[in-house]
């Protein structure tokens, strides 16, 4: 008897860790050294967590052996509540905050609690693909609105408006954006929120990169601009505090919660079912948010992340036929390959061919639900020497590549 995967997974996809990565693992098993530009995982690139965070987690391990409240430790949630005040998000109490095993778990929970079969959710293209996967897994229909590369990758408000239907339940905003690195202006956010207001949409705001900003870019929390809208804000420690392996994130519910009691009860139920988030990592939150913000040393001159972002941008734009909008935040670049110079029909095949030829791992643009096979994503985490070697390999490969 054959056992097949559930039909619920028919439209679920997460190609950041997809078939190309499987080939990379096989090559590593054969003894090849793979230069990895595929995942925003700071620690393997030498970005260590602040010592005080690690020390506090170690110090609290003896008291972290049991379950916590399903929403999380009071002290950690209070620290998040105080962070809401810094970000000017109004009306948030301790009970409006949920701690999770990373933002990923909370995204899936929030979609499972909200969506019925056929409900539509507006998601940016390109996006962080977990958003699309979570909507599909919950029985919803992801509808992708275009971000405009010619306008610094800002979302196209007209495209969002055109894609709203009677079935649309929610609008997803990823700011700073993964994979493009765009940081949205106040005017843009207000325009997006006005569409949500007109059509009574729930707003999901992914703000995991809110402290990773370059060139004096300013992050504005979506919920701070819309106290009248139900807004779910997602953030965590993985990127800004370099502890992705801790799986420590949070969800903040703001706005008219009295209109969403049934939905919130659904989130509560799912939070209870998974018992609680990883308790040792919850002890990192108060120290991280209340301590010295060492991320600023990395993103302000002469910080390492800033230097690597700059070099990545310069090197990509030096490759004939490749152009890249300068990322203003996050840990990625999302360059375009001019189809007139190097026509690519299948960008997953391009990523695999690059891996096999150059032992270099990137992620194809369609993995981020970009509709055309003309982009790819690289992380800006490697040291400058490795970035120069990697992007040099991409340039050499494209010189002779054809499909």
Model regions and ranges:
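N-terminal small-domain helix-loop-helix segment of the aminotransferase-like
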Residues: 2-102, 109, 276, 288-291, ...
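Helix C-cap/helix->beta junction micro-motif
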Residues: 27-30, 138, 198-199, 229, ...
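PLP-dependent enzyme catalytic core of the Aspartate aminotransferase-like
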Residues: 86, 161-162, 343-349, 353-362, ...
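Conserved PLP-anchoring active-site segment centered on the Schiff-base-forming lysine
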Residues: 113-135
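A short helix-loop-beta submotif of the ANL/AMP-binding
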Residues: 137-143
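Active-site phosphate-binding strand-loop segment of PLP-dependent enzymes
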Residues: 143, 148-219
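Conserved core segment of the aminotransferase class I/II
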Residues: 227-303, 313-314, 398
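Conserved glycine-rich beta-strand-loop-beta hairpin in the small C-terminal domain of fold type I
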Residues: 286, 303-313, 324-338, 372
